[in-house]
Amino acid sequence: MTMSMVKGAGGSHSETKHHGQHHTSVPQGSNTQENTTKSGFRAQVQGFPRGKELAGFIALLLGSAFLFMWELDNNSYGNDFYAAASQAGSKNWTAFLFGSSDWGNTITVDKTPLSLWPSALAIKIFGLNSWSVLLPYALLGVASVAVLWATVRRYAGSTAAFVSGIVLALTPVAVLMFRFNNPDAMLVLLMTCALWAAMRCVETGKWRWAVLTGVFVGLGFLAKQGEVLLIIPALVVLLAVVSPRSWKVKLGQSLATVAAMVVSAGWYIVAVALWPSSSRPYIGGSTNNSIWELTLGYNGFSRLSGNGSAPGGGAGGGPGGAGQGGSASDAAQGAASAASNGTGQAGSSGQMGNMPQGGSPGGGGHGGPTFSGEPSILRLFNEQLGGQATWLFIAALIALVMGIVLCGRAPLKNTKRGLYIGLGVWLLMCAGTFSFMEGTMHQYYTVAMVPPMAGLVGMGAADAWQHRDRLWVRAVSAAAILTSGVTGFGVLRRASDSFPTWLPWVILVATVIGAAGWFALPWMSAAGARRHADGSVPSKLSARVLSLRVAVVGVVAAAMLAGPSAYSAYTIAHANTGSVVAAGPKSDSGMGGPGDGGPGGTAPNAGGTPPNGGNGQGMPGGPNDSGTASDNSSNGMPGGSSDGKGGSSASAGKQRGASSPGGPGQMTVSDTLKSKLKEDSDKYKWSAATIGSQGAASYQLATDTDVMPIGGFSGSDDAPTLDQFKKLVSEKKIHFFIADSGQGGAPGGNNEITSWVKEHFTATTIDGVTVYDLTQEKSS
């Protein structure tokens, strides 16, 4: 019998040849189905955490909960568009099932409704308030941290898991989305769960894990449709390549995953498609009331290409974009100009500002460059995206390469290497898509890349410490420290108005010291340890050496995490409301602007300059406080001031991250207008109707009465038609029409509705808002 020792990932890898048979003992953290011993490392990571590990896990979850819940009500209802849909779902089961914006079931939100259901149930139980709307998403964030921790711990150990959880919890865009009611919080949890289930399938070979993987992906599709597909390549690699099963089993399990995915998502799509359109709400975001078009177009290929029915439509397609005769790029240029020079002024008395000649409020095309800059290989590091998720992106890539190399000659089916590969493919798929997609690219989309980035950083940190005796490991680890610190320095320097001027320099100094100290760890140990008489170093390090090591690790952690921590603290301390949000301070260009069909502002003219009345900081009819770069403000909408925490606005009525035309904000509805809309509201199906879901949502939340969102999110969907609206008015089902919703008119039927109302009913002005009583026609 011969024995050879080969260094592998996680420890020594021994091979024994005996009587012609070859037996392989798998290194720590790398067991396969054939070697699932309950001793040593595997016993530690497969069982429930105990002792210090349990204490660390609890501290991690409590810290995450603190970050995601502290002063959560500062964000009021978050995104009114989704909050109103949750409110509607709490009052009507049909609205709950379809995700209707109103419980009269006029039109749905522009997503499948799974992410709305937790908050709808919370509102039903606890009533409508900030906590019932937002707390479910904070809990989804804590669950995401827990699932990532459990996944990394099982295959890479508790240290890697703890670091991974910290990175996920401190990344600014994750803090933003786990304190907000967009679908992204649920999407992140379900994608992380899908990776966990796939890894369990690779480890055990049991079919139930393959099925569960597909279920998580399918549910993710019902949360945010096409974005969940970003994890599919990683799952394919794990199930079809990394898995140690035979090709027949791998093929069968892959097909089982696909079948489970189709069933768990398809049941809803088919049910809606087969449901009689007369007994369900219009499918928001589609041009023909079709769930298929919403799925494949608006939330599918159009997001990538910028063509078709992407959010905001083409020029002239909805509020806040380029008017007819102007291009989407003109809209973006004009939006940035309005944001940067603060020259846009609100229309007086709650009226819309002047429109550019030849156009009504436009859609803004795909809007990608407006929110996140031009597509390029460096897009993730530009002014708009650099502070969101990519603080440790380069470090994660370095960890990926280092980790795979450290796995050495361990078999491909090695589960630790499999996790490295799965996380790496997921991260690269997100990075490539977000860098080059031509369609609408909001900054907060990047939250989907945070779990794989955090997992790779955590695993890389643990491996770097375990193999710190290797020169090349220390060298690449020092490079990861340097790139992370320099990235943090650059991002904070760009936002110097919002942070102490000394902070980026402290991070830079800590980066240099930390990288040098890490590289010099072996020499520190030899120099600081007490030696025996023969000159040898004892196995137990002296207190001095231990102190040096702790200091080095502390400086490294500060260098890598101080930047994202500062951005996250800023995000927590400032209100985040509206449909265009971003973590950290507002950038001077690109935040908000035309393109996603959101309300607010008017379209630039064909030359790209903001028209008179184009409001860079406020909404039509609301005061314009000329917010500064550090305000991240989008001030009041019709009929309300921008200061005060009433109605559906956040504290101070501020909306961060949307300072240019098209950046939708929240409004504070005056008490007088609230009373008017509530007047005899129990006698009508809708207390009021107005153009666009965003404005309607704010009125609905403020009054707790049903408000019809004509035209849906963009204000341009054909729901209801003019004839349908006339019929509802004649049947006395709508009490008021609010002319100033902040979204204005849109081409087609909705402009016709506004014109018809103005022609047949008398206008009254309430606190700057034009309101028509649809029960009182003009005298002929």
Where are these regions (language model features)?
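Membrane-integral, polyisoprenol-dependent glycosyltransferases
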Residues: M1-G308, Q324, Q333, G342-A475, ...
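Short linear, low-complexity motifs centered on an aromatic residue
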Residues: R303-G334, A338, A399-G403, A461-H467, ...
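Transmembrane helical bundles and short interhelical boundary loops of multi-pass, membrane-embedded
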Residues: R468-G590
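Membrane-interface segments at or immediately adjacent to transmembrane helices
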Residues: V556-K683
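Aromatic/acidic, Gly/Pro-rich catalytic loop(s) in extracytoplasmic/lumenal soluble domains
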Residues: A575, S641-S642, D671-K685, S693-D706, ...
